[in-house]
């Protein structure tokens, strides 16, 4: 996600200045703008399902990076990266939100829902 790595997300950190101001590098929060810099402060993170696609030029690499950080810290996480070949098109950033009734959007929502239902069922069984 572009918001998960705002300090060093490169050209795709387009949310940094609007959210933190043009002087974001001078703020006390600057060292804590990337998810991998703050994850150690969390006591526990919930199961996390990440969705991206080959056409997600805004956040594909950062979503994979976030997945790697979550995995390295023992967080139950799953990622689904929709390839162009799956639906014969490059799906855009947040396609499941923009196109929830298209086949790819419906599939993404259904898979995320199944992931969270399984995680909640497992938690309830403990």
What are these regions (language model features)?
Residues 1-126:
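Alpha/beta-hydrolase superfamily serine-hydrolase fold, recognizing
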